[in-house]
Amino acid sequence: MKMKSTFIAATLLLVSVMTEGGLSAQNPIVQTCFTTDPAPMVHDGTLYVYTGHDEDKADFFWMQEWRVYSTKDMVNWTDHGSPLAIESFDWADDRAWAAQCVERNGKFYWYVCLHSKLSNTMAIGVAVGDSPVGPFKDAIGKPLHDGSWDYIDPTVFIDDDGRAYLYWGNPNIYYAELNDDMISLKGEVGKLEQTVESFGAPNPEKRVKDVKYKDTYTEGPWLHKREGKYYLLYAAGGVPEHIAYSMSDGPLGPWKYMGEIMPLQDTGSFTNHCGVIDYKGNSYFFYHTGKLPGGGGFGRSTAVEQFKYNADGTFPIINATREGVSPVGTLNPY
């Protein structure tokens, strides 16, 4: 296999790996380090992906930083390094797990989960920056929400009416509305009632041992909207995980379980975590695998597939590939 690389503005761009048949193999999109829990965002014509960073030869999710990558053509990726880390939060000490960044009013808000020294459990934090690649700083000097091992994997969504929502949780699903400042919660935190109809199975405490449910929400929610419908994607099925989803007519439900998107398959990782984005007229599904050499369940890498929604707005089945996506547009290396 032949790896091609290009330097643009003194920044490493990962281009493509060529397979024996001459087919371009784009997955994983970053091949110099492990990148997990991808969260895409489009700003000013550029697609950014915010990821976690699994440590080399790790035996658990001992993660210390988050990373940012960007592209204008979906195959050449600029590495912006790590503009946010555990040390950015004085109240935290470990487990820089899944996160998502969004833009509002010229500011970029990066919602993260990490281990809190205050509660000795997991917590949701928020950092803010003036650029999509930072620098970022702790926006409030304390957790946005603290106090439970459930509090992981935040996803944030700003609706057409300007209201912003935060979802998170494993194995329960929590939600809250954000104030306009994006760094405080509006009202009380809620917990979704999981049912067979909404998520394939009841709440975790109501599940009956040895009963085979349609599905089970696990973690990693991703909330987005398309043509008036709301989609909540998530890792499901326990260990190992696949990706499933529910749909609703409103940002807070009621939700209806719709089935699997990425069925269980040989990704080399017992977890999965997805993000969905439209860019340059195409729809993209980001996820992670353990397929980078030396990788596995604690060494995961971001991958991406292009897809088209079904005519009725539902998701097609999306399978993990080595080939990934084709370029969109052209790249000027100067």
Give residue spans per PLM region:
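Bacterial Sec-dependent N-terminal signal peptides
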Residues: 1-26
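Carbohydrate-active catalytic/glycan-binding domains of CAZyme proteins
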Residues: 23-334
